[in-house]
Design a protein with these regions (language model features):
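Cytosolic-side transmembrane-helix boundaries in multi-pass membrane proteins
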Residues: 1-59, 68, 272, 279-286, ...
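Interfacial/capping segments of alpha-helical transmembrane domains
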Residues: 65-88, 208-221
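Single transmembrane alpha-helix segments in multi-pass membrane proteins
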Residues: 69-73, 79, 87-143, 162, ...
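Hydrophobic alpha-helical segments embedded in the membrane of multi-pass proteins
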Residues: 102-111, 128, 171, 193-196, ...
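Alpha-helical transmembrane segments within multi-pass membrane transporters and channels
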Residues: 148-189, 193
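Transmembrane helix-bundle core of multi-pass membrane transporters
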Residues: 187, 191-256
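Helix-loop-helix "hairpin" substructures at the membrane interface of multi-pass membrane proteins
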Residues: 239-312
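Transmembrane alpha-helical segments in multi-pass inner-membrane proteins
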Residues: 299, 303, 307-374
Length: 400
């Protein structure tokens, strides 16, 4: 009986402790939730200019920390900065190299920004980029025998090839959009999976049926010489002002679509507040599919520019630059604003160009450039991803 009484008292005491601790735990959780709500409110209420200011401040801080790391590792930070500037803008070749990277970052960055701005996560831009590139090359090679050689035929083939790339990229983007809108599938998972599928299928085609006759390397046949962007201003292989002009034109068109059209309004509303959009008469599911298709089409155009301006053929995508993945950081740096993608792409293009120069002409490890880019991504992505997560999960003190 005594033991039973002691156990009963012990049980009652434990229950009292649990009841006593419960309100404190609830208070702690409540305070933490209120703190998250306040932070979410501030991020969600921030204007585009405020978000860009946060991105610029984060980038500046990341660059300063990067220079501190350079100094700690035993290198002269001022000499490092000099090498970066020289590698990015030191001469005509450096500028052309920087603008080449910038062109690709702008196009792929806009593709990411379209989806992210609408509240959906298209992580499959790299796959859509690869599909668009191969589609461009093969459509041009197949159609070339039916069109006259020369400038006129070359322009027609470029237009047809780029259009085919946009269609292929758009279809690749539409699939995860359909799965999300009508099957409630997580688009992050589906787009990542489609990246692997795209790279695998394109790699098989380049190494097999589409491999150029007599090629030792897994490449397609080269495009006809008259199917190329003209070398204007810069006489540098791998870059043409025409490619940059296409990228800037895409930025303008996307900006106008997103800010001046009903589709742009529906796109953003459906992504962030699907129930409210449906109540207002918007077919939210159809709009999500259209958004992913639009994003994929721009990624396909990026692949077309890469194939025509840089390669002149198509190779195993395993060796193709990962512009589609880097574009996620570019878009986040620009606060998912298509206009902001231009300076963000220039920053990444300049750093990539500088890394190429430093790797050849300096004893400074090129990995330091990668480290600085990583810091920029970390500092910039954290607040923007928190804002996007808050919008998607309903964080915030107000009803949204």
């Amino acid at each position: 009986m005594s033991n039973e009484g002691e156990q009963s008292e012990s049980s009652n005491s434990a229950s009292d402790d649990e009841r006593g601790a419960g309100p404190n735990d609830d208070d702690d959780r409540g305070r933490a939730r209120k703190g998250l709500d306040r932070a979410a409110d501030r991020m969600l209420d921030a204007s585009v200019l405020e978000r860009l200011a946060i991105a610029v401040a984060s980038t500046t801080l990341a660059l300063l920390i990067g220079l501190a790391i350079v100094a700690v590792t035993g290198y002269d930070p001022l000499l490092f900065v000099s090498n970066v500037i020289e590698g990015a803008f030191g001469d005509a070749n450096a500028i052309a190299r920087t603008l080449r990277f910038t062109t690709m970052f702008v196009l792929t960055g806009v593709a990411v920004a379209i989806a992210f701005r609408a509240g959906v996560f298209n992580i499959g831009v790299q796959g859509q980029f690869v599909v668009g590139g191969l589609t461009t090359v093969m459509s041009i090679l197949w159609l070339a025998p039916f069109l006259p050689e020369g400038v006129g035929g070359g322009v027609a083939l470029i237009v047809l090839g780029t259009t085919a790339a946009a269609i292929a990229g758009g279809l690749d983007g539409a699939l995860p959009g359909v799965l999300k809108a009508y099957g409630d599938a997580n688009e992050i998972i589906t787009t990542i999976m489609l990246n692997f599928i795209a790279v695998g299928v394109v790699g098989y085609l380049v190494e097999g049926p589409f491999r150029g006759e007599g090629n030792r390397a897994p490449n397609t046949e080269r495009l006809p010489e008259y199917v190329a962007f003209p070398r204007i201003v810069f006489d540098s292989s791998g870059f043409s002002v025409v490619g940059l002009a296409i990228a800037l034109a895409v930025v303008v068109v996307v900006t106008l679509v997103m800010t001046r059209t009903r589709f742009g309004y529906d796109m953003i509303t459906s992504g962030h507040q699907q129930d409210a959009a449906t109540f207002a008469g918007v077919d939210a599911r159809k709009t999500i599919v259209s958004t992913m298709t639009f994003s994929g089409a721009v990624a396909g155009i990026a692949g077309a520019v890469f194939a025509i301006m840089i390669q002149g053929y198509y190779s195993d995508p395993g060796g193709v630059a990962t512009y589609g993945f880097d574009a996620i950081a570019v878009s986040l740096l620009a606060a998912n604003n298509p206009l902001g993608v231009v300076p963000a792409g220039l920053l990444f293009g300049g750093l990539d160009s500088a890394g190429t120069h430093i790797g050849i002409y300096s004893d400074v490890p090129v990995q330091l450039i990668d480290g600085i880019l990583g810091l920029v991504v970390l500092f910039v992505a954290a607040p923007e991803l928190f804002r996007m997560a808050a919008a998607r999960t309903g964080l915030g003190g107000e009803d949204r």
